């Protein structure tokens, strides 16, 4: 479940902090969130795809670690990122 180039560029443009930003934490979390959403939809129709389920859990863990890093650095960046992506209540 990979993202095509246009989808990646759209996510990068939406979440980048400056013009040439492609690897900031915000962009990484946004990319992971999109891949997690796609893989979750896949797993709803393919319940027995255990290797994809394991990959999904790894991506969720990576996103959690990145969000914890952002939260330690700046609470305002964390809260704006979470609300922008619509994750966590």
Swiss-Prot record:
It holds the Pfam family Ribosomal_S15. GO terms for molecular function: rRNA binding; structural constituent of ribosome. The keyword Ribosomal protein applies. Keywords: Ribonucleoprotein, Ribosomal protein, RNA-binding, rRNA-binding. One of its GO terms (cellular component) is cytosolic small ribosomal subunit. It comes from the Bacteria. Belongs to the universal ribosomal protein uS15 family. One of the primary rRNA binding proteins, it binds directly to 16S rRNA where it helps nucleate assembly of the platform of the 30S subunit by binding and bridging several RNA helices of the 16S rRNA. Forms an intersubunit bridge (bridge B4) with the 23S rRNA of the 50S subunit in the ribosome. Part of the 30S ribosomal subunit. Forms a bridge to the 50S subunit in the 70S ribosome, contacting the 23S rRNA. This is Small ribosomal subunit protein uS15. The lineage of its organism: Bacteria, Bacillati, Cyanobacteriota, Cyanophyceae, Synechococcales. The gene is rpsO.
């Amino acid at each position: 479940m990979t993202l095509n180039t246009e989808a990646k560029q759209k996510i990068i443009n939406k979440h980048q902090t400056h013009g040439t930003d492609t690897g900031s934490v915000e962009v990484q979390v946004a990319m992971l969130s999109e891949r997690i959403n796609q893989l979750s939809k896949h797993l709803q129709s393919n319940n027995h795809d255990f290797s994809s389920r394991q990959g999904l859990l790894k991506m969720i863990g990576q996103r959690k670690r990145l969000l914890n890093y952002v939260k330690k650095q700046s609470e305002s960046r964390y809260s704006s990122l979470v609300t922008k992506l619509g994750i966590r209540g």
